[in-house]
Regions:
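Active-site proximal loop and beta-alpha junction motif in alpha/beta enzyme cores
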Residues: 1-132, 144-179
């Protein structure tokens, strides 16, 4: 949308429900969005009880999901790092994780497959929307979770069913999304 508006400026501010984001046009067809800093505490995500949000275990349909990383990047996310992100039927397990009692405001669910330290492929269940072909906040949440778990560098490409986003994390955990 921004690229087609013939703006005199290459930078604007975008107001969301709970954040003010800086956006700037980079190159001919891309926009970099400063997403801000993630929130990590059980209260800020939020979780219904105080636990380690960087190592969550859930049981869904007799399947045990371990090592879930919960983070709020403007909305709440849980990321599970798995061998094959498309192995899991998100249409079945996505809504069950989204509506789990641990998540009082529901949660976005990402199955993430680390290809290498610069590339991650994801399969995303977005709360209230279902399985999606792409999700910017899921890309940011996945990148910060991978970086904190030392699975990826502070700059990583997140690949979706359709397209990809480049995510950079600076020294203060500020997240930049380009696509």
């Amino acid at each position: 949308y921004l690229l087609g508006q013939n703006l005199n400026t290459k930078e604007i501010k975008l107001k969301t429900n709970n954040r003010l984001l800086n956006a700037r046009i980079v190159g001919n067809l891309e926009v970099e969005l400063e997403m801000g800093k993630p929130l990590y505490s059980s209260e800020e995500i939020p979780l219904s009880k105080t636990i380690n949000p960087a190592n969550v275990t859930l049981e869904v349909d007799k399947n045990k999901f371990t090592g879930g990383f919960c983070v709020n990047v403007g909305n709440p996310h849980i990321i599970f790092f798995v061998k094959d992100c498309f192995e899991y039927d998100l249409k079945t397990i996505g809504p069950k994780i989204e509506n789990h009692s641990l998540f009082p405001e529901k949660i976005n669910v990402t199955m993430a497959q680390v290809i290498d330290e610069n590339n991650i492929t994801v399969n995303v269940w977005e709360r209230g929307a279902g399985q999606t072909k792409a999700c910017g906040t899921a890309a940011c949440a996945t990148a910060i979770a991978a970086f904190k778990n030392r699975l990826a560098h502070n700059e990583v490409d997140i690949k979706f069913k359709e397209g990809f986003l480049n995510i950079k994390i600076d020294k203060t955990d500020n997240i930049f999304m380009t696509g």
